[in-house]
Regions:
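Cell-envelope/extracellular polymer assembly enzymes that use nucleotide-activated donors
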Residues: 2-4
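Short, well-formed alpha-helical segments that are part of the catalytic scaffolds
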Residues: 9-26
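Conserved donor nucleotide-binding strand/loop of the catalytic core
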Residues: 46-75
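A conserved acidic beta->alpha catalytic loop
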Residues: 33-46, 57-59
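Short beta-strand-to-loop acidic/aromatic patch adjacent to the donor-nucleotide binding site
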Residues: 77-93
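Catalytic-site signature of metal-activated, phosphate-bearing donor transferases
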Residues: 63-71, 93-238
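Short, well-ordered alpha-helix to beta-strand connector turns
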Residues: 27, 49, 80, 88, ...
Length: 238
């Protein structure tokens, strides 16, 4: 049995080294789909031992890109192998590696990990409401060759999950955390807020992404649909 790391990335040079190094202990191979990065991300990935596939596509379509990468995995994988799919700014928390290893040896087929949002400092996380317990399916077993990622109604086919749609009806939560660095700094949070509202405008379900910038563009005391007022605590207490 092999475990394949999977990443779909664009311009993640700041974080990619720690991300790839964090998942190597549980992976036999790491495959990266690079979406036209111009900051050296592909070279960094290759220097860390990952196999990089430059995007042959134009435009944003997350599910299409993930399907393409999964087909590349299938070129050498077999049914019964596993995949760990993380973003280019998410690192597997080292103390939780044994939980991932146990899950791979279990009867589960799809496992969710706790996404921990680092906020303002690397030793501090956001914990108000949705942010406290947010989990995402990221570890899955290759059960059949027709696995694919779901199509959504959101712009850019955002929010298509990190596990194939065929496995989302049987999700096992495991005590493992991914440290999310992409919201660590205010400038990045504001940039992401404007990016999401540009490619996925007027998304009422996501409350127009206002939760991302509570304490930045909106007062810290704001209470919106998914989050707020802003609450932070030490990573060590998570």
């Amino acid at each position: 049995m092999n475990v394949f790391g999977m990443l779909r990335v664009k311009n993640e040079a700041r974080w990619i080294e720690r991300v790839i190094e964090s998942i190597w202990p549980v992976c036999d191979c790491i495959f990266v789909f690079d979406d036209h990065s111009d900051d050296g991300t592909p070279d960094l990935c290759e220097s860390l031992g990952a196999v990089v596939y430059p995007s042959p596509f134009e435009g944003i379509h997350e599910a299409r890109d993930k399907d393409y990468l999964l087909q590349k995995v299938w070129e050498i994988a077999e049914a019964g192998d596993w995949c760990l799919m993380v973003d280019g700014d998410e690192a597997l928390y080292e103390p939780d590696i044994p939980a991932v290893e146990r899950a791979i040896e279990s009867a589960a087929v799809c496992c969710s990990l706790h996404i921990v949002y680092l906020w303002d400092r690397e030793d501090q996380i956001r914990v108000d409401r949705w942010y406290r317990e947010f989990r995402r399916p990221s570890l899955f077993k290759l059960t059949q060759r027709n696995l694919s990622f779901m199509r959504t109604t959101f712009g850019g086919n955002l929010h298509c999950s990190s596990a194939p749609i065929q496995l989302l009806s049987s999700i096992t939560p495991i005590p493992a955390r991914l440290l999310h660095y992409g919201y660590l700094y205010r400038n990045d949070r504001v940039r992401k807020y404007h990016f999401y509202n540009t490619i996925d405008p007027n998304n009422a379900f996501e409350d127009r992404y206002r939760h991302m910038v509570i304490g930045d563009l909106f007062p810290a005391a704001s209470a919106f649909k998914w989050a707020g007022p802003l609450e932070l605590k030490p990573l060590a207490a998570s």
